[in-house]
Amino acid sequence: MSVVPVADVLQGRVAVDSEVTVRGWVRTRRDSKAGFSFLAVYDGSCFDPVQAVINNSLPNYNQEVLRLTTGCSVIVTGKVVASQGQGQSFEIQATSVEVTGWVEDPDTYPMAAKRHSIEYLREVAHLRPRTNLIGAVARVRHTLAQALHRFFNEQGFFWVSTPLITASDTEGAGEMFRVSTLDLENLPRNDQGKVDFDKDFFGKESFLTVSGQLNGETYACALSKIYTFGPTFRAENSNTSRHLAEFWMLEPEVAFANLNDVAGLAEAMLKYVFKAVLEERADDMQFFAERVDKDAIDRLQRFITADFAQVDYTDAVTILENCGKQFENPVYWGVDLSSEHERYLAEEHFKAPVVVKNYPKDIKAFYMRLNEDGKTVAAMDVLAPGIGEIIGGSQREERLDVLDARMAEMGLNKEDYWWYRDLRRYGTVPHSGFGLGFERLIAYVTGVQNVRDVIPFPRTPRNATF
C-alpha cells in the first residue's frame, strides 16, 4: 500500500483495484440514507478533490466520520475504483479513515464551504490557499516559475543570485526601502547634523533592491548569458491593482546582444511558458476560464500563435494622436505611454502583442543606450492585449563617456557606480536585457484582476500582516 497524491488517482496514474493512501483535507461531506458517506478530499496536488466512499461499517464511522466538516485533515486508505458518479473517473472505496486534525468550531471557521469575496480572502491570507481560487493560482505560479527556469536553462543561460541589499538605485527613482540597524531613538549625526550612516551596519546608506539588473550585468559580462529571478522592492505609495511593495522580477541579461535580440528572446520566452501552463495546468486553467475570465485559455492560445508587431515610439505616438479616440491622459511626443495608450495599441490597432522601441531618453533610465539621434534610447516595452506592458527592457549603454554624461544629466554621482563603470573600462561589450514582473505575468495568465491575489502574502502600503 502506497501513499499517493490525489492527482495520481484522478489522472489515472494508479491502477484500478490497487490499495492506496491519500492524505489531505475535507472539502465537503455528504451522507447517504443507504449507510454511506462521501468525503471530497483534496491535498493541493491538483484542482479537484478525490471522492472517498465511506461505509458505515467502519469502526469510527459514527464517532468521527459523521463529525467531519470542511477543513478537517484526514488520512484515507482504500481501493481505487472506477467512479459511478459524474465529474471524475476514479474514486476510493475507503477501508479506513484516520482523522489527524479537527476544525475547532465549524460555525466560525473562516474557510467554511461557501464562496468568499476576494477582499475577504486577503484578510485571511494564511488560510486562503485552501480555496479553489488561490490554490489554482499557487499551482500556476509554480508552473510558470519552473517553465521560466527550464526555458533559460535550455537556452544556455546561467541563473545568478543577485543581492537583496544594495547601495545602488537601479532606476534612479529614489523610491527605496532603507535597511538600517541604527537606533531610531538615538541616531548618530555628522558635522552637518545629518544621519551618520558610517555608523550603520554596512557603513553606508543601504536599501532593499529595486532590481537585480546592475549586478546581473557584471555576470553577463563574464558568463555571456545570465538571468536573475527573485524578490524586488519599491517604496511606492501606490494602492492599485497593479502595484506591490514586494514582488518578483525575472531579469535576463545577454552579452553581445542588441535590442532586437532581446525582443526576440522575450517573445520566445512568453510563448514557451504560456504553452507550458496550458499543457501542465489544464485543470486549473479550465477553472479560470469558467469562473474568473472566460477568455483565459483562448487569450494564451492566440498569444502563442500571434506574430509580434514592432513599432517605434515616435510612430506609436502618431498612431495614438490620429486614432480619433479620446484618452484620459494626453498623448504627445515625450510622454510616457499610459496603460490606456498601451492597450489601445495592442488591442485595437495592432490586435496582437506589440514591441514599442526607441523611447525618449528623458523618460528612461540612465543605463539605456543613447541612439544616434541623441534624443531617444534603445529601450523597449512588450505590450500584451488585455494588460498592456508586460516586459520592459533595453540595450545597455556600453560607452563609458556616454554613460558618464547620462549620469551627470540625471544628477547621479558616478562615483557611487564605480564598479558598474568598470564594466565599460575593462573589455566593454554591447549587451541587453529586460525585466518581467512575475505577478503581472500570473495575473495575465489567470485573468485575476489584482496582483495582491497572485502572490502568497501581499506587501502593500500599511499592510505587512502575516
From Swiss-Prot:
Do you know which InterPro entries this protein is assigned to?
Answer: Aa-tRNA-synt_II, aa-tRNA-synth_II, aa-tRNA-synth_II/BPL/LPL, Asn-tRNA-ligase, Asp/Asn-tRNA-synth_IIb, NA-bd_OB-fold, NA-bd_OB_tRNA
Q: Example GO molecular function term? A: ATP binding
- Check the UniProt entry and state the signal peptide residues, or none: none
Task: Kindly name one Pfam family recorded for this protein.
Answer: tRNA-synt_2
Where is it chiefly localized?
A: cytoplasm
What SUPFAM superfamilies does the record tag this protein with?
Class II aaRS and biotin synthetases (SSF55681), Nucleic acid-binding proteins (SSF50249)
Q: Does the keyword Aminoacyl-tRNA synthetase apply?
A: yes
| Domain of life according to the entry | Bacteria
A GO BP term here is:
asparaginyl-tRNA aminoacylation
Q: Give the enzyme's EC designation.
A: 6.1.1.22
- UniProt keyword annotation of Protein biosynthesis present: yes
Q: Which reaction does it catalyse?
A: tRNA(Asn) + L-asparagine + ATP = L-asparaginyl-tRNA(Asn) + AMP + diphosphate + H(+)
What are the subcellular locations of this protein? Cytoplasm
Q: Which GO terms describe its cellular component?
A: cytoplasm
Task: Give UniProt keywords alphabetically.
Answer: Aminoacyl-tRNA synthetase, ATP-binding, Cytoplasm, Ligase, Nucleotide-binding, Protein biosynthesis
Assembly notes: Homodimer.
Q: Which PANTHER family does the entry link to?
A: ASPARAGINE--TRNA LIGASE, MITOCHONDRIAL-RELATED, ASPARTYL/LYSYL-TRNA SYNTHETASE
Q: Which family does it belong to?
A: Belongs to the class-II aminoacyl-tRNA synthetase family.
NCBIfam families with a match to the protein in the record: asnS, PRK03932.1
The protein depicted here goes by the name Asparagine--tRNA ligase
- Provenance organism: Klebsiella pneumoniae subsp. pneumoniae (strain ATCC 700721 / MGH 78578)
Q: Which gene encodes it?
A: asnS
